[in-house]
Amino acid sequence: SCFSGVLTRPLNTFVIGGFTMICTNEDTKLINEIMRDFTNITKIAAIFVNNRGKVLSQEYNFSPFCKVVRRNPAYAKRCNQCDLYGGLDATKELSSCPYRCHMGLIDFSVPIMKDGAILGFIMAGQTKTEDTTIKPILPTQTDWHDDTKLRALYRTLPVLTAEQIYSATKVLRILVEHYFPFNDAIAEEMPYEQLPDFVESERPINRPEIRKAM
């Protein structure tokens, strides 16, 4: 559960597999402060999503490219998938390895935990890189390159080196763990519904609490 002491009025409430997950006003305030400070310093975009990939915060430093992409229902669905699977990976690996989203941009995720429950994930990124070692999170990429508007917006995206990207992931994780310490030993089993087979086949999930949840 994510209750701690006297609960203030729930701001973000969502039910997963019978479990009620609540971000209190104080939780949400801290999460937004983390994202604001991180994006102000790095100029990298960030949002907070729940355990279903649903966005629960304002968009911090969002690129025009991604704003247009997420207004397309088909694209937005794949964005949510990337957010969710990126969060799963970050949780099971206990690290925040960057990945390529379905549009080819570099993103990374840091889990937010409280009292052994995962409240959600801070998703950050929306950058380009020439580094070819960062792999896609989904098995197929979205074919968007015939869209003239998206091509023009893509050219305006920031380009980071691999070192800059990995430094950003480290900074965000340090910020998050200062306010929301990550305790793997007491991590609650995440009550996910059945996920697509490729999540297991492409990236074997070894953490028992995630495997049981699937």
Residue ranges and their predicted role:
Residues 1-20:
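Short, Lys/Arg-enriched N-terminal segments with co-localized hydrophobic residues
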Residues 8, 97, 122:
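A broad, low-specificity signal marking well-ordered, structured residues that form hydrophobic/aromatic
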Residues 18-104:
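Structured interaction and signal-relay segments at domain junctions
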Residues 21-40, 120-211:
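Juxtadomain coupling helices with adjacent low-complexity linkers
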Residues 107-115, 124-127:
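A short, hydrophobic, proline-anchored segment that marks a local hinge/packing element in signaling
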